Amino acid sequence: MDTYQKTIGSRLMAFSFIVIVLFFILLYRMVEIGVLQHGHYLALAESQQRFEKTEMASRGRILVHDSVSDPNSYYPLSFDVKSFSVWAVPNQIRDKQKTATDLASLLSLAKSDIFNSIDNSKLYIPPLKRGLTLDQANNISNKNISGVFIMPEYNRFYPEGTLASQLLGFVNADGVGNYGVEGHYNSELTGKEGNVVGEKDTLGRMISMLSQTNPQNGTSYVLTIDRSVQYFVEQKLAKAITDYQADSGTVIIMDVKTGGIVAMASQPSFDPNNYKETANTDPAKFVNPAIANLYEPGSIFKPLIVSSALDSGVLTPETEGVFDKSVNVDGYTIHTAENKAFGRENVAQILQHSDNVGMVWVGDHLGNDLEYKYISKFGFLDKTGIDLDGETAGRMPALKQWRDINRATITFGQGVSVTPLQMVAAYTALANNGKYVYPHVVDKIIYPDGSEKQIAKQEGEQIVSQKTTETVREMLYSVVQSGKIIKSLTQGFKVGAKTGTAQIPKADGGYETNESNLGIFIHSVIG
């Protein structure tokens, strides 16, 4: 009996001890939760009652004028279209096989691809599909699939397809502008997201709003591009490439008074609506050759050298020389293009005949220092600063590296590499009484609040005198009158222009050749 009572007593004491220990543990937890971690659990409770929703902002539009349809209206070349994307949180999906089956039919995707994407326990995976219509989004939402949700977003749309595509650039799937206007003005075009913070009940319904920040749409830009002129230029360029079996081509039209680019076209181009296809097949098409591709300009460089000689006073239009069909410089023989001796010529006739040997003589009168100085003043050693992504500066040996052969070949546009836009900008100085005007593509800025800002032209320095430009313009007019092709195309207009042909230089020296080891040439006309 005593043994039994002792056993019972021991057990009661042990039980009491355990109860007391548990009591103190429970008491500690209550103090910890209610006092020590009160803030943490209060925040957790509030977070379960709160919700936060992001409101998307629309990217700014890119607009142009149209001198034919309505000069006072704007026409969009790039704007946002609201669409939807479908997302999944794999660790919240209860039946992944069924989910993959349901989504495959709704999204027109392979069931296996969907299943492979969601067959994990991740909290985040990339969207299963973007660019859904409202009907598609509603069909998925109505299924109430666990772990699958719809997000509104904006997709960039280019209503004119390939028109001015390399000037515009494109917007990628993450909403980031690449190349062209889209890339250059990406931060301004991109709007600021808004958000709503509120409280919800146990069923997830909003019962009060705590704060709201409205989305701010992006800034819009009106370009200097004329839609009808751009379309006309692209059609003519495409036909010329086909007719002459050329690999590519570029056309730039610039307002010589304002610097505004009226048209800028290159072929081949791409459709920014389908930029992914181009990225996979030929991403080089994204690059705008008008501002990025370097080439040796050839004879279209000659009027700029003549302008330099006249402006510096080392020659006059009537200064004469006698020229053979070739000349030797530093051991190199330079020929006229037709291997023909033009004999006695004045400066105007040298330009009219496009005489390489005569141009070497012009360069001799200029000398290294003056020739280099004027080439720099015409802007060939720097970027033009146009408001487009991807511009390249011209290239030419440093003055201290020049020999006589450098000075000689540069007078007829070889040994110097430029972009098409640099050439156009330099020629606009000749048309603008010697004043350089910086090229640009934005005409007006439209801010999210509706206010507008007109972009003023930006003038550079006086490169040559007005008298010099008047003289050279008359020379270029004579060049057109003495020719046949340009003259026949410009009846009724007084046009000054110059044609040029040059080989394509290789990075390691020499010139590009085709499979038959024949030179590859670039043909140009400017005026």
Name what the model sees in each region.
Residues 1-276, 369-381, 488-491, 497:
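Periplasmic/cell-envelope proteins involved in peptidoglycan metabolism and beta-lactam response
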